[in-house]
């Protein structure tokens, strides 16, 4: 299922994860889709300001937060250019990783400018990020190695840091049974099990650089094997991110074991 660039009409009343209250002292990881930083998106500066405020507020409540940022349009464009002369997936992945680290730097510097206690460097590995998250309240990173999308990196960071959940903030309203661009009758889901999500996105196999799906299948496989809950939502509405972090109802899909 590919990323969807428009809000879908089949939105229902916000849903709340049962038995999870993230009022204070929580560790949460957020996977921010690179599309949220696209330069052509209107009011992107307002979105960034809202996101920074949300993170600052959660840190003030005692949370520790890892943020993993995708490459978005810069990654896809760079990969498209290079693919004319490069056919090795690992080499193309490295181009995408560079774009994710650029986007991560934008988020990190914005947080630092607002006085949020964020780690001073962009980690190059999940293990490094875990160490940083033990020292600072917020860590921002991009991709790490070829074959691992930022969804996968975020879920791995959530697992290794003992996070309560991983929030997948993308440009998709919910998880659908099929891509609604291809099938207008595709069914939106308020909730799924991890196994059901794996069945929708496909087997946990890397599908090449620059791919765009609601959640990367490899990352879902990691979530399945570690029973890591996922909140999947349209991050273009920053309020949905806030609601998820606060453990409140939000418009999106709750995925649990």
Spans of model-derived segments:
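C-terminal catalytic "cap/lid" subdomain
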Residues: 6-7, 11-257
């Amino acid at each position: 299922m590919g990323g969807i660039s428009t809000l879908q009409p089949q939105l229902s009343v916000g849903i709340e994860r049962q038995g999870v209250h993230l009022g204070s002292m929580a560790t949460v990881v957020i996977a921010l889709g690179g599309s949220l930083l696209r330069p052509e998106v209107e009011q992107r500066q307002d979105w960034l300001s809202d996101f920074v405020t949300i993170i600052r507020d959660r840190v003030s409540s005692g949370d520790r937060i890892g943020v993993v940022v995708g490459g978005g349009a810069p990654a896809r464009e760079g990969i498209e250019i290079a693919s004319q002369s490069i056919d090795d997936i690992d080499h193309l992945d490295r181009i995408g990783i560079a774009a994710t680290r650029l986007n991560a730097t934008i988020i990190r510097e914005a947080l630092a400018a607002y006085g949020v206690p964020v780690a001073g460097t962009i980690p190059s590995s999940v293990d490094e990020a875990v160490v940083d998250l033990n020292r600072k309240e917020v860590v921002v990173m991009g991709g790490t190695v070829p074959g691992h999308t930022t969804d996968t990196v975020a879920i791995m960071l959530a697992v290794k840091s003992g996070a309560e959940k991983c929030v997948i903030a993308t440009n998709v309203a919910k998880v659908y049974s099929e891509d609604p661009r291809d099938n207008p009758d595709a069914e939106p889901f308020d909730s799924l099990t991890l196994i059901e999500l794996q069945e929708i996105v496909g087997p946990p196999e890397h599908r090449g650089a620059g791919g765009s799906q609601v959640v990367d299948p490899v990352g879902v496989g990691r979530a399945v094997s570690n029973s890591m809950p996922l909140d999947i939502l349209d991050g273009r509405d920053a309020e949905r991110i806030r609601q998820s972090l606060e453990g409140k109802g939000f418009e999106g899909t709750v995925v649990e074991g």
